Regions:
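Universal eukaryotic N-terminal targeting presequences
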Residues: 1-2, 55
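An N-terminal hydrophobic leader/cap segment in hydrolases
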Residues: 78-142
């Protein structure tokens, strides 16, 4: 048995390993036998078959050992309380290998824009082969106010409402497309039976802020003014919904139309929205570092990169590091009464401020060049809805937040400010959910969120 094993290793590794390791097992005379054995021992087909089979098994076992060792080294366990943990553990690992590790290499070679192209390619892969829409839904590609849109029209049998839902997809203003949300849109339509229009706004960095804002506004105005007749819905019953960066655009859109005294939007639904870019050391950001640091779930560096690409600022590694350390703000601005009150962590639920998850931090000294450019942009409510001084008169809102999400706290702060200004606001928090769960197929948590959204729309639109 030992002889067969040694001959197999000789076939796989050659004389180098034979001379380096086998002296511990065999004297020189017997090693010589194995060195010539390759040329003289295997004379028959059966002997060659056994040798090749042994070599194949050895290679297979070595590859298995290598893969197991690699997985063991790279494995980052997800928190026990997170939903869809087994599926997410595999998806997170694959995305981390491709988008994070390979992404770092691509960024080194081709810069942050090249990395963004890689991310777009990777997120598109699961949607290359898409299933046909259900028989009760017609999907059309339309151009509305010069902007591409994906329109979902229910059949006569499925149509339960004359209202319409405008959806603004997420993806950090830089990635994702409306068709990636087909599954969620079909599931939602089955519940509410209304027309859905998903806006395919132009992505950054090809265009920068505020192009996406302006395109979404143009689409909603056109739907209200004229396109409603073509798609068969009541122009006085329009709701707008967005997730992540789409939630940001939805909140901004509601504020802009209110400022123009246009009562177009009757309800706004914000799903784990981006609300401000002031604080990258909030309790929810700190929770990432403490509980799932290094994973490919939405992380501080990705969020900082999205902001920089969206705003047309240099997305260098140095700038990313400065933003995640809150050095994109001057200490004077951070400590100003208005900003300090707006970002006060004590407004958050006490369970998010426990010392195992959170440590209050002093405002660092800001980077002069970066803060001068960033502060002017962050003070614009078209980027940071939280800075708006007057929110009264906005359409009633539903805000959904997730327990495992760096954006959790800004969504909660916006809920508090909306309520403070008299805006009827329903807050639904999902402690086990993670950022991006709307795109997780066969998820009980996604099902619950869609059920809650559908119930809210049926009752209020």
């Amino acid at each position: 048995m030992l002889s067969s094993f040694l001959i197999t290793q000789r076939l796989v590794y050659g004389d180098l390993l034979l001379d380096a390791i086998f002296p511990f097992f065999l004297p020189a005379a017997e090693r010589k036998h194995f060195r010539v054995g390759l040329n003289t021992d295997a004379q028959s087909f059966g002997e060659w078959f056994l040798l090749v089979t042994g070599m194949s098994v050895a290679v297979f076992l070595i590859l298995c050992a290598f893969v197991l060792a690699l997985v063991s080294v790279l494995h980052i366990p997800l928190p026990d309380g997170i939903c869809d943990r087994l599926k997410l553990q595999l998806l997170e690992f694959l995305l981390r290998i491709s988008n994070e590790y390979l992404g770092d290499l691509v960024e080194l070679l081709f810069g942050p824009v090249g990395r963004n192209y890689l991310t777009r390619f990777l997120v598109a892969l699961p949607y290359i082969f898409q299933s046909r829409p259900p028989k009760w839904c017609t999907v059309r590609q339309e151009t509305i106010a010069g902007v591409r849109c994906r329109v979902y029209l229910p059949s006569k049998e499925m149509k339960k409402s004359t209202a319409a839902l405008v959806f603004v997809h997420g993806g950090g203003w830089c990635i994702m497309r409306p068709n990636y949300y087909d599954g969620a849109m079909y599931s939602l339509m089955a519940r509410i039976g209304m027309t859905i229009i998903s806006i395919d706004y132009q992505l950054s960095p090809e265009v920068q802020y505020p192009v996406a804002v302006e395109e979404c506004e143009a689409v909603v105005k056109a739907l209200h003014a004229e396109k409603h007749a073509e798609f068969g819905f009541d122009p006085e019953r329009i709701a707008v919904m967005g997730d992540s960066a789409g939630g940001n655009l939805t909140a901004v859109l509601a504020q802009r139309l209110r400022a123009e005294n246009l009562n177009i939007i009757k309800r706004q639904i914000l799903i784990y929205p981006v609300i401000h870019g002031f604080d990258f050391q909030s309790p929810s950001y700190q929770s990432y570092y403490r509980h799932y640091n290094g994973t490919s779930l939405l992380n501080p560096y990705s969020m900082a990169r999205f902001y920089l690409l969206y705003l047309g600022l240099p997305a260098t590694r140095e700038n990313l590091r400065k933003i995640t350390e809150n050095r994109h703000l001057s200490r004077a601005m951070r400590n100003s009464p208005a900003v300090a009150e707006m970002l006060n962590h004590n407004q958050l639920p006490q369970e998010f401020l426990q010392k195992e998850d959170y440590e209050p931090k002093e405002a660092p000294e800001g980077d002069k060049e970066l803060s001068e450019r960033f502060e002017k942009l962050l003070e614009d409510s078209n980027l940071s809805p939280l800075v708006a001084k007057e929110l009264a008169g906005l359409p009633p809102a539903m805000v959904l937040t997730c327990g495992f999400d760096v954006l959790r706290d800004e969504g909660i702060l916006y809920v508090r400010k909306l309520r403070k200004h008299g805006v009827a606001t329903k807050w639904s928090h999902y402690p086990a959910a993670f950022h991006g769960v709307l795109n997780m197929p066969v998820s009980s948590q996604r099902k619950q969120m869609l059920d809650d959204i559908a119930a809210y729309l049926r009752q209020n639109l």
